């Protein structure tokens, strides 16, 4: 806080494996720094969502990288998609601002609209789209990165999707 940092992002690996996460969130919040979370969502039970909220968490960004089969394949865990959606629902039920984190690759670009439609039905209204980071697990799938032309098309699809929701009177943040 003394250095003017407005936000601290707790991310991974998976930050929810830390038993002291709520303590760290409360410390940041008490110091005037906005604590936010980046997670795969699978460890967010109803009780954990309330605990995170009570500690002062301001936002949970849950990573979903495709529709169920593609997401589970990417995550290497069967049921990861369903676990992420349950985590999202638990956060929303606890009153936490919650959004989607989606890394667009050649392998999951076709799922963009389907994932947004599905999670909008759950109550998500914030969608953050990312390009592939060549660090961590991204080093294993560098070949799945979008070409510049495909990236432009994906961005255009996100813009078109946002406009379509707006035109229907539904506001989403992208």
Regions found by a protein language model. Give the residues of each.
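Radical SAM enzyme [4Fe-4S]-AdoMet core and its adjacent flexible, acidic
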Residues: 54-55, 59, 63-65, 70-174
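Conserved alpha-helical substructure of the radical SAM core
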Residues: 1-59
């Amino acid at each position: 806080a003394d250095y003017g940092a407005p936000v601290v992002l707790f991310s991974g690996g998976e930050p929810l494996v830390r038993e002291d996460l709520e303590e760290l969130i409360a410390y940041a919040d008490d110091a005037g720094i906005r604590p936010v979370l980046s997670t795969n969502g699978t460890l967010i039970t109803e009780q954990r969502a309330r605990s995170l909220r009570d500690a002062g968490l301001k936002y949970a960004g849950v990573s979903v990288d495709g529709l169920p089969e593609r997401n589970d394949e990417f995550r290497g865990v069967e049921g990861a998609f369903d676990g992420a959606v349950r985590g999202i629902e638990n956060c929303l039920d606890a009153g936490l601002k919650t959004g989607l984190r989606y890394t667009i690759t050649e392998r999951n670009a076709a799922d963009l609209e389907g994932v947004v439609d599905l999670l909008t039905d759950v109550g998500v209204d914030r969608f953050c789209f990312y390009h592939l980071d060549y660090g961590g697990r991204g080093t294993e799938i560098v070949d799945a990165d979008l070409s510049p032309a495909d990236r432009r098309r994906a961005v255009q699809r996100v813009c078109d999707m946002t406009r379509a929701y707006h035109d229907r009177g539904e506001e989403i943040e992208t």
